[in-house]
Each structure stands twice: as C-alpha cells, then as structure tokens.
C-alpha cells in the first residue's frame, strides 16, 4: 500500500508540471516542502528505488511529448502567432529547468534519509519559507503539486501534534563556508557540476559562502595571479548563474588584513584576517544569494588589496558568522560577556558546514595504508592523523623525500588543521566535509567506467552501493555516505585490478569535533592479552569507572533495568576492559570467557579464552547521530580486540543488520533465540574456535532485573 502511495505521488509530480512555472517541477519556495513530503517520510529502500525509476522514466517520455508539440507548432498552419500556446513548454531553458529539478529530487531520494534523519533535518532547517508561517491559510486537502495533504502529513513522519511555525524575518541564515582549491585546474564540466550541487544545497536551506583558493598557481608576476583569480571568479559566477535565481554575488571588499595584534581569548584562533565590512556578507545572505569571495584582503596599513591565504579567509568568515570577531579593545569582550549573560544571540549566521572541495579529496587513511578516512573524530584522532601526515612531509631515514607525496601530504595536513580550527569555533553538531570535485559534482566515475569496461572485468561490481552526492546526503542525514566502522571490503568495489578497485572508492571525509574515547586498560600502554589466572584485573567497581553512569547508559540503551549485583558478580573474574565514549554517551564492556567444560587455568594454557563483547550500549538520544556507535565499535575492533571478538544478539533484534555489515560472519544458533557474530578473520577455518564461540554465546547467563522479557 505504501509503495503504491509513493508511486501515485510520483505520478502526481509529473501530472502537475503544467500547474507550475514553465518547465519547472518545483514552484518558488517549495523545494524543501516537496522534499520532506516525498523523500523524508521514511520510505523503504525498495520504495526509494521505485521513486527513482519513476522519475527517471518520465524524463524521456516528457521529452518526446515536448518534441511532438514543437513539431506541431512548426508544421500546422493553424498554430500561428495568435494561436494558443501548447501546454508543453517549448524553450530549452524550460526543459533544462524541469530536468534539473528532476535530478535534484532523484539525488534527494538517493540519500536514503530515515525518520530520525528527517526529524533532525526539520529541527535544523524547518523554520524556512517552505514551511507554513503563522497566520497563513492552511493548505487544502490537495498539497503541493497535487500531492494529497493526507500523504504529506502521515503520522509516521511527524510525531505528536503538528504546530504551525512562525518564521522570523531576522532569522539567521544557515551557511556553509566552502573552499574550492585549484579551480583553475577544473574543466567546465566539473565546475558546473559543483555549482549545481551548491545551488541544490541552497534549495535545501544551506547558503554557500565560497572562498577560492588559487595558490597552486605560481606566476612570475603578481598581475598574472590577479588575472587568474578574476578569471576563476567569473567562471564560477557564470556556472552558478545557470541554475536559477537569486544569482551569486562577489564580495571583494569584506576581508581585511590587520597589522595590529589584539588580545583575544585563547579559544579563538589567531588570524591576521577579519571581516571589515560585515554587511557585504549579511545583506546578500539575507536575500538568499550565494557569495563568492576571491582570495584577496584589504590592508588597513597599505590601503591596498593583496593576496590572502584561503584558509585564513575561511577561519575569518567562520569567526565572524559565529559572532566571535571583536575589535581591538578589551571592552568588546566585556560586551560579549554581557550579551551571553542576557541570552542575546550574537551570531551573524548559523555555520552548519565547512566544505573543502579539493582535487585530492578527503584525508587519506593512515591505518589501512590506502583509501580515505570516512569519518574523523577530531577529539580522539586528530593527533595520530596529524603525525602520520607530517611524517610524509619529512625526508626518510635515507635522506630522500618523494616530492609528490610530500606536497599531497602538506595539502591534506592544511585541510585537517583547517577542520580543527573551524570546528573549535562552532557548535558540536557542526561538521567539515572534505571531498573531491568529481564527487561534489556527482560525476559517477565508477558507473561510467563500468559501462566502458569489458564485461568480464566487473564480476563483483554489483556489490557496490548506490552512488550518492556526499554533500546532499550529509546535509539530509548528518552522516557520511558510508559508516566509518564498515570493513573496507563492504565499501571497495571488486575488480581484477586492485588499483582500479581502489580508484573507485569514495574520497570524502566527514570530520566532527566528536567525543573523547577512554579505554580501560589503555591498549596503547599494554596490548590486551588473555589474563593469567590469579593475576589482579580491572573491576567495574574500580574508582576509574563511574558505575552509576555506566548502569544508566546500559538501562537507557536497552530500555530495561540491569540486575547490577548479578552482573558485577558474573564479570568480576572475566572482565577484559571497558570502552567509554564522551561522558558515558556510549560504551562497550568486553570479557574473556571460558568455554563450557573447561576451567580458567586450562582455557588459558590452551589459548581458548574467548574474546567476548558482553555489552554494547549507546544513549538513546545519541543513537543515529554523531557517530557514537561507530566510534565505540572502531575502538573495539581497532584498539581493544584487533585480532577479533565475538558477540550474540537476539535473532529478531533490529540492530542485527548493523552488526552483520560490520562482522566477518554470522551464525543463527539452532534451538535458541541467538544469532552469533564475530570479527575474527580465521574463525570459520578453525573448528575448535567456532565451537568455543558458539558455546560461550549459548551459555552466558543474562543479568536483567526483569526476567520475563527475552534476554538481550
């Protein structure tokens, strides 16, 4: 029934074309209402595919109809200047607008946003022109573009009583500060594709302030650098101008360079650049314009414009929009403190994203030796990644240095530090997305290569996932396209040539301020090993562990109360360690279990102690957001138990799909309600290990206060 409803909604889109502006699928200010009505109502994956196929199939049909109508106008003598126009738009602009809208809807549908994602998007971007303002007449039973209001307002989508939202005219706009590196090296197809994506972000409520970075040009004369910047600015303006109004504006007088060094709080990065003319940014943003900022700054000493570092401009803009830019006097900081104490907002805009579009893509993975970091928890991973990149910029022990590797590592290092500096100025829910122009433009290289390759070259290509635009996907879901805890085999397309397979992997990195990760005992000091019997070991009652908060985490995550006394007694002699994310927002308890029929001494001597994930918990408010589950899981499989771990879950547990994607294997245990998972590479080929794993997963006693419910 639901699939049929979605298909009828899709048909309503096609049939409603004639009721909108010429050739457009979307009326003015309706983009977000449309998106939420159709694509964010928690459609299943199959329904999403049905919608995508429906949109794609109607494109060719509409083009044929328009061609027939145009032919009639040219051939029939009755269709003269005074004859009524056909209901089909005939201009190339109208067709382009319609096709562009259709592509936009498909890209949104491909984001696979869930109910939780939809609620998060609404909470951030809901108070927009696309939503009903207070005092306006409520829509009739026929919604936007013929979609019934009963479908658009399904109870499964909006929980609780719907309230009309009053939109304030002085509401701060949602902004993405975007850096385009080396645009002079992009061809027109890439640039236009990126421009299209940025206008789509605008349609979804996120305005871009674009900073050009042309530092790869090393001219002999300063004038040629200025010519290059001017040329690239004009190219970008033309590209954005192809995709509707309001058009982009150049802000060439807003960034200033100071020769003085004002005393600023330590939490604000030191920067010679600042926004000297704020209205040059705030006024056009209030009118919905995308802004383009050339890498130039006005010096208050020389009274001239000169070259400026693009990263410094990004930091200056972020500081300004966040309301953290102040003058030279200490009184400015006292005024800030007064505003904060009075609850006044001093932000000029809400910076939700910082986007870096770089030909090199995201940050390379330092753990796997190839591929790209999918997600970076800066609070926990920044130093290790920075050290790995810095090492590549230095000469080897033999005194040699690969210039190409060093140059790329330097760029990645600058982008990583830019992410760290900007996120330090922004709320914890802000993020930095680093991607390549091809991915930002949604140019599907892997599919194109698949079509061009020989049939026998892609035996496993069907296992690759749907290609999605990483920027649109992240805006709607606040997640990377792929989960960071997925094994590389789940992401990498299979190909006979390993280099070709790696070239098709995603190159987008999502960075967040994230959470600190604490592991007891610390595996960086001593690697976790099966404990010798009788040796003192960690206990959950030790002072380093906040037991009440740990119990609350477990109770909240599982939705039931733990029998604390029984649980402490059960794990007191088997505890391997504990992982804590943030302030007990997520965690894992891991043990060394003894197979049935063996004593601990024998199991230790024979190497048969089983590494077991006893509890994996995430606070409900943190589930599906911020990557808390991925952070905990990564800490477990990379740091705590890198050689493998097993665990069990009820066969009907909804989280089993998540477990399955991250495990090496799964086995439904006969004559029980348990499914067993493991990450140990050699488990399947080791019969004794598999029997021990199964024995432990069958016989672990549950420790819940309510024994009437099935064990978890």
Curated annotation (Swiss-Prot):
Main localization, broad class: mitochondrion
Every N-acetyltransferase domain range: 534-702
Biological process annotations from GO: L-arginine biosynthetic process; ornithine biosynthetic process
Induction per the UniProt record: By histidine or arginine limitation.
PROSITE patterns: GNAT_NAGS (PS51731)
The entry's keywords: Acyltransferase, Amino-acid biosynthesis, Mitochondrion, Transferase, Transit peptide
Chain spans, region Disordered: 55-99
Regulation of catalytic or functional activity: Inhibited by arginine.
Catalytic activity: L-glutamate + acetyl-CoA = N-acetyl-L-glutamate + CoA + H(+)
EC number assigned by the record: 2.3.1.1
InterPro entries found in the cross-reference section: GlcNAc_Synth_fun, Vertebrate-like_GNAT_dom
Disulfides per UniProt: none
EC class of the enzyme, as a word: transferase
Residue span of the annotated presequence: 1-47
Compartment annotation: Mitochondrion
Top-rank taxon: Eukaryota
Biological role stated in the UniProt entry: N-acetylglutamate synthase involved in arginine biosynthesis.
Family: Belongs to the acetyltransferase family.
Protein name in the entry: Amino-acid acetyltransferase, mitochondrial
Species annotation: Neurospora crassa (strain ATCC 24698 / 74-OR23-1A / CBS 708.71 / DSM 1257 / FGSC 987)
Gene label: arg-14
């Amino acid at each position: 029934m639901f699939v049929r409803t979605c298909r009828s909604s899709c048909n309503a889109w096609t049939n409603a074309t004639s009721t909108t502006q010429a050739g457009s699928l979307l009326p003015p200010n309706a983009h977000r209402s449309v998106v939420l009505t159709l694509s964010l109502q928690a459609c299943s994956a199959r329904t999403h595919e049905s919608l995508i196929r429906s949109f794609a199939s109607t494109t060719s049909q509409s083009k044929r109809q328009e061609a027939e109508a145009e032919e009639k106008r040219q051939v029939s003598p009755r269709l003269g200047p005074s004859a009524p126009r056909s209901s089909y738009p005939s201009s190339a602009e109208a067709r382009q607008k319609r096709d562009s809208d259709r592509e936009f809807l498909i890209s949104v549908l491909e984001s696979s946003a869930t109910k939780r994602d939809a609620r998060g998007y609404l909470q951030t971007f809901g108070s927009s022109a696309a939503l009903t303002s207070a005092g306006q007449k409520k829509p009739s039973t026929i919604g936007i573009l013929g979609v019934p209001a009963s479908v658009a307002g399904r109870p499964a989508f909006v929980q609780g009583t719907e309230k009309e939202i009053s939109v304030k005219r002085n509401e701060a706009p949602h902004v993405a500060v975007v850096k385009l590196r080396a645009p002079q090296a992009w061809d027109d197809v890439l640039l236009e594709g990126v421009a299209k994506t940025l206008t789509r972000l605008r349609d979804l409520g996120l305005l871009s302030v674009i900073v050009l970075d042309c530092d790869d040009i090393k001219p002999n004369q300063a004038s040629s650098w200025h010519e290059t910047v001017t040329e690239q600015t004009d190219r970008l303006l033309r590209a954005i101008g192809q995709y509707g109004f309001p058009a982009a504006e150049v802000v060439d007088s807003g960034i200033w360079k100071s020769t003085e060094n004002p005393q600023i709080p330590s939490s604000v990065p030191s920067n010679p650049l600042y926004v000297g003319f704020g209205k040059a940014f705030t006024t056009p943003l209030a009118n919905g314009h995308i802004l383009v900022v050339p890498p130039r700054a006005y010096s208050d000493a020389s009274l001239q414009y000169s070259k400026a570092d693009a990263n410094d401009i990004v930091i200056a803009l972020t500081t300004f929009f966040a309301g953290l830019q102040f003058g030279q006097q200490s009184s400015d900081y006292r005024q800030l403190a007064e505003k904060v104490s009075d609850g006044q907002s001093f932000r000029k805009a809400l910076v939700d994203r910082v986007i870096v579009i770089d030909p090199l893509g995201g940050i390379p993975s330092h753990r796997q030796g190839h591929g790209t970091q999918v997600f970076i928890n800066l609070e926990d991973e920044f130093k290790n990644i920075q050290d790995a990149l810095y090492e590549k910029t230095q000469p080897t022990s033999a005194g040699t240095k690969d210039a190409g590797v060093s140059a790329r590592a330097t760029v990645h290092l600058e982008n990583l530090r830019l992410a760290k500096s900007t996120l330090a100025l922004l709320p914890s829910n802000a993020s930095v997305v680093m991607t390549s122009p091809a991915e930002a433009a949604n140019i599907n290289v892997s599919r194109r290569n698949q079509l061009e390759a020989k049939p026998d070259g892609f035996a496993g290509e069907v296992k690759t996932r749907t290609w999605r635009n990483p920027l649109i996907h992240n805006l709607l879901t606040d997640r990377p396209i792929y989960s960071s805890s997925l094994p590389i085999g789940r992401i990498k397309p299979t190909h006979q040539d390993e280099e070709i397979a790696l070239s098709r992997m995603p190159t987008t990195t999502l960075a967040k301020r994230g959470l600190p990760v604490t592991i007891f005992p610390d595996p960086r000091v001593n690697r976790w090993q099966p404990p010798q019997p009788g040796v003192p070991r960690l206990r959950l009652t030790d002072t380093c562990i906040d037991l009440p908060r740990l119990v609350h985490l477990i109770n909240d995550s599982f939705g039931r109360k733990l029998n604390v006394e029984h649980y402490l007694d059960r794990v007191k002699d088997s505890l391997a360690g504990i992982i804590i994310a943030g302030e007990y927002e997520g965690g894992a308890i891991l043990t060394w279990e003894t197979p049935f029929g063996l004593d601990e001494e024998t199991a230790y001597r024979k190497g048969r102690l089983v590494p077991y994930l006893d509890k994996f918990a995430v606070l409900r408010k943190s589930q599906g957001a911020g990557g808390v589950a991925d952070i905990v899981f990564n800490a477990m499989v990379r740091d705590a138990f890198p050689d493998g771990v097993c665990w069990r879950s009820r066969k009907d547990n909804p989280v089993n799909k998540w477990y399955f994607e991250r495990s090496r294997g799964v086995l439904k245990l006969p004559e029980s309600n348990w499914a067993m998972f493991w990450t140990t590479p050699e488990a399947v080929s080791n019969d004794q290990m598999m029997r021990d794993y199964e024995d432990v997963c069958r016989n672990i006693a549950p420790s819940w206060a309510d024994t009437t419910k099935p064990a978890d």
